[in-house]
A protein has these predicted regions:
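Short active-site neighborhood of thiol/selenol oxidoreductases, capturing the structured segment around
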Residues: 59-82, 86
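Buried hydrophobic packing residues in well-ordered domains
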Residues: 53, 72-75, 86, 117, ...
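N-terminal targeting signals for export/organelle localization
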Residues: 1-49, 197-201
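Hydrophobic beta-strand anchors of alpha/beta hydrolase catalytic cores
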Residues: 67-68, 102, 168
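Thiol/disulfide oxidoreductase modules built on the thioredoxin-like
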Residues: 137-193
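Sec/Tat-exported extracytoplasmic proteins
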Residues: 65, 72, 90-97, 121-124, ...
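A short beta-strand-turn-helix
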Residues: 46-66, 90
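Structural microenvironment flanking redox-active thiols in thiol-disulfide oxidoreductases
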Residues: 81-141
């Protein structure tokens, strides 16, 4: 699947944001292994329903490090890899792993029903939360994150793939977007950078 659709544009935007952050960097600021996007003007608060049908806002998770990832349950590679890395990172954090909340936003609300989404996401970690909206709501939230989602028709209406941007967004406990983690960075990068956010909060 072409899950890196549009990543060249996003990479440019993130590089610009990182450069601006670097110009104002405190010499004592944490040295992250992923991209520091502190001060970025995207990825603001949103509301979607969780897999139990309860409305959730990003701001509901202040006090924890919130980790936002867009994907879908039929994803063959990027999504299970990223969720596995996050589950491993949380284990590496030990007791501090309880202060991390992973939010998986489905890019395929047509097939990812609440039941399907819950079964999939909690298989990686029972504390992970899956979020879904209508196709229109999903498109709106994706746009707010500069995430590109494209449905590719298959052999029938239920057999298709979804291209989606593959990075992960990490918020500090105060609710500020701080990091963009590119696909394939690995569990150790997640664990290292999340630990720094928890320590500095």
């Amino acid at each position: 699947m072409r899950a890196l659709l549009g990543c060249a544009l996003l990479a440019c935007l993130l590089a610009l944001a990182a450069g601006m952050a670097g110009c104002n960097r405190d010499p004592g600021a944490p040295l992250f292994r992923s991209t520091d996007v502190t001060g970025a003007d995207f990825g603001r608060d949103f509301q979607l329903a969780d897999f139990d049908g309860q409305p959730r806002r990003l701001s509901d998770f202040r006090g924890s490090v919130a980790v936002v990832f867009f994907g879908y349950t039929h994803c063959p590679d990027v999504c299970p890899t990223t969720l596995s890395e996050l589950a491993s990172a949380i284990k590496q954090l030990g007791p501090d792993g309880g202060r991390v909340q992973v939010l998986f936003i489905t890019a395929d609300p047509e097939r990812d029903t609440n039941e399907v989404l819950k079964q999939y996401v909690t298989a990686f970690n029972p504390r992970f939360v899956g979020l879904r909206g209508t196709p229109e709501q999903t498109a709106q939230v994706a746009k707010a994150f500069k995430v590109l989602i494209q449905k590719n028709p298959g052999t029938d209406s239920n057999n298709y793939t979804v291209d989606h941007s593959a990075g992960t967004y990490v918020y500090d406990p105060s609710g500020r977007l701080r990091l963009y983690v590119a696909y394939g960075q690995g569990a150790q990068v997640f664990a290292h950078d999340i630990a720094l956010l928890l320590k500095s909060s």
